[in-house]
Regions:
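Generic alpha-helical secondary structure signal
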Residues: 3, 15, 83-87, 94, ...
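A generic secondary-structure signal for well-formed alpha-helical elements
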Residues: 2, 9-12, 35, 39-46, ...
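Conserved small/polar residues in nucleotide/adenosyl-binding loops
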Residues: 34, 166-168
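Short, helix-capping/interhelical loops that line the mouth of catalytic, cofactor-
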Residues: 40-97, 101
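Helix-loop segments that flank and shape redox-cofactor active sites
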Residues: 6-27, 48, 52, 99-116
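Active-site-proximal cofactor/substrate-binding loop regions of enzyme domains
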Residues: 20-44
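Amphipathic alpha-helix face/heptad-repeat signature
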Residues: 1, 31, 85-92, 121-128
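Structured surface interface patches that mediate subunit assembly and partner/cofactor docking
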Residues: 47-59, 80, 102-166
Length: 168
């Protein structure tokens, strides 16, 4: 799914980033910034210790002040936009892959919500890339060729359903 999205962004070019999606009126640039931000978070949490807390605290502080997630990610992005954002996001995709490919799948990692296993964390990254990727394809009026590669996403949806009611 990451490759599909990367190929689409490269084909459309950085100009497509200003396109508004149907998800909360986020632009494609907002979406890619969001994916980039939390890819970095996924790498930081795998490091253990205070790495994740140090990453997430400034974002959470903004959320506590009433900022939206997009507004909270702006200081973290520090002016990274356009093609550089696409490139930095893609590097973060590769960093997540490299970090998790040999990780103990049962290792517990911190996150904004409850801790989860490394296996669940990487599945969550896959799920988020798939879902936000679909929103980008839809915003650009493009069809995405679906393949039988989302079993883990469906599994995550089933096991996480109960957690979805915690924040209501």
């Amino acid at each position: 799914k990451r490759q599909d999205l990367h190929e689409l962004l490269n084909a459309e070019g950085a100009a497509c980033l200003s396109t508004t999606t149907l998800f909360k009126n986020w632009t494609i640039e907002d979406v890619i910034g969001h994916l980039y931000l939390f890819n970095v978070g996924a790498v930081e949490t795998l490091k253990g210790g205070d790495h994740y807390e140090n990453f997430y605290k400034p974002i959470n502080d903004q959320l506590i002040k009433g900022k939206s997630l997009v507004q909270a990610q702006v200081p973290w992005l520090d002016g990274v936009t356009g093609q550089r954002l696409i490139d930095d996001w893609w590097k973060s995709v590769e960093d997540v892959f490299d970090g998790y490919k040999d990780a103990d799948p049962k290792k517990r990692v911190k996150w904004a919500g409850p801790e989860m296993s490394a296996r669940s964390k990487i599945t969550a990254r896959h799920m988020e890339t798939w879902a936000h990727g679909q929103e980008v394809f839809d915003a650009l009026g493009k069809d995405r060729e679906e393949k039988d590669r989302i079993k883990n996403i469906v599994h995550m949806g089933v096991i996480a359903y109960g957690l979805s009611l915690i924040h209501i």
